């Protein structure tokens, strides 16, 4: 093969790898919370829970009063279960959400009261 042919093959391979990698890293880009979600707070401790069925772009809040709220991360982001924030997919693996939930929610809704200083 000539140097020119090798060069073109190398460029095409690079473009292919870049396209495949970009496609793998894209989260869903929802603009509203979808209907028909199956998540339930029943049996869960109060806290924040990534919805893995929605690729972590949707997350749920289960309150101590047994209320349930559904929230959506912005386009291009997913819910980082470890830090309880919306984050870039390159910073968190949605597949880890279930195992990270208990530790992340251990102190959710906990109110810390500072002692009154004594003069």
Swiss-Prot record:
Q: Where is the signal peptide?
A: 1-22
Instruction: Tell me which PROSITE patterns the record gives.
Output: CHIT_BIND_II
Extract the Pfam families matched here: CBM_14
Cellular component, GO, one term: extracellular region
Instruction: Fill in the PTM field for this protein.
Output: Contains 3 disulfide bonds.
Q: Which cysteines are joined by disulfide bonds?
A: 73-86
MF annotations from Gene Ontology = chitin binding; toxin activity
Where found, per UniProt? Secreted
Q: In which tissues is it expressed?
A: Expressed by the venom gland.
**Keywords linked to the UniProt accession:** Chitin-binding, Disulfide bond, Secreted, Signal, Toxin
Q: Where is the Chitin-binding type-2 domain?
A: 38-96
Which InterPro entries does UniProt cross-reference here?
Answer: Chitin-bd_dom, Chitin-bd_dom_sf, Scoloptoxin-like
**Family assignment from sequence similarity:** Belongs to the scoloptoxin-01 family.
Looking up PANTHER family in the UniProt record yields:
FI18007P1 (PTHR22933:SF31), FI18007P1-RELATED (PTHR22933)
Which protein, by its recorded name, is this?
U-scoloptoxin(01)-Cw1a
Originating organism: Cormocephalus westwoodi
């Amino acid at each position: 093969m000539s140097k020119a042919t090798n060069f073109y093959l190398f460029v095409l391979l690079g473009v292919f790898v870049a396209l495949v990698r970009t496609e793998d890293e894209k989260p869903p880009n929802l603009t509203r919370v979808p209907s028909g979600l199956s998540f339930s707070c029943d049996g869960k401790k109060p806290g924040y829970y990534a919805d893995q069925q929605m690729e972590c772009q949707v997350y749920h809040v289960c309150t101590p009063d047994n209320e349930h709220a559904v929230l959506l991360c912005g386009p291009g982001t997913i819910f980082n279960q470890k830090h309880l924030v919306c984050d870039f997919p390159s910073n968190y693996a949605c597949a880890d959400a279930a195992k990270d939930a208990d530790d992340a929610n251990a102190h959710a809704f906990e109110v810390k009261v500072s002692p009154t200083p004594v003069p």
